[in-house]
Amino acid sequence: KDVVPIAGVIGDYGAIAVAKNSPYKNFKDVVAAYKANPKSVKMAGGSVRGSMDHLIGALAFQEAGADPNKVVYIPYDAGGKALAGLLSGETQILSTGLGEVMGARDQVRIIGITAPKRVSDAPDVPTLKEQGFDVQFVNWRGFFGPPGMSSGDKKKIAKMLGDVQKTPEWEAVRKRNAWVNIYNPDKKFVKFLQTQTKETVSYTHLRAHETTVY
């Protein structure tokens, strides 16, 4: 409430990825390995426990019938470092945003995303839902203004953001990252934020075991 919501712009679905040489071909393989030996599967993320990276993986394990509070989650201080941890073998899976790994597909295999159906910009990437794990989750990006921002300025910026999404330059960036446009200005954005807040609060019980990497 200390800022003024202007508009939401994009959504980035969650993704679970493994190294190209991983024996895991899908999320069912990961779940089977975890249930056989929980210590054999460590999950990397580019932010702390309770963050979007953590929640994506934790929700997937919960839907699979595993206790997400016992899954070892290793938080790195950036997405690039989390990817490096996966590729080095320090972790077996990476929980992140789809946009984060689209540019690394020569090194990783994306084995599940949190979209309700496959996305057109990555048609070969399966959803978790189609594998039997109904996890649907989108991490959004939006713009906010300072307290006291005038209604006129807010509308002007919101319109500009909407116009940007109609340009070929924006479409190229969106497609490269497999983002989805969720342009929702002003009151629509406020309503969206209220819904997202309720959903996020409902996930606070997920506390995967955390191992810190320095």
Over which residues does each language-model region extend?
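Short beta-strand and adjacent tight-turn residues that come in two discontinuous sequence segments
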Residues: 76, 95-96, 113, 184
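Conserved small/polar residues in nucleotide/adenosyl-binding loops
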Residues: 204-211
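Short helices/loops that flank or line small-molecule/ion binding pockets
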Residues: 34, 59, 63, 80-94, ...
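Conserved functional loop/turn residues at catalytic and ligand-binding sites
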Residues: 26, 90, 132
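Well-formed, non-transmembrane alpha-helical positions, independent of function
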Residues: 29, 84-85, 100, 127, ...
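Hinge/capping helix and adjacent helix->loop/strand transition within the periplasmic-binding protein
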Residues: 1-81, 141-173
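C-terminal lobe and pocket-closing loops
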Residues: 99-166
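Mature extracytoplasmic/periplasmic domains
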Residues: 155, 166-191
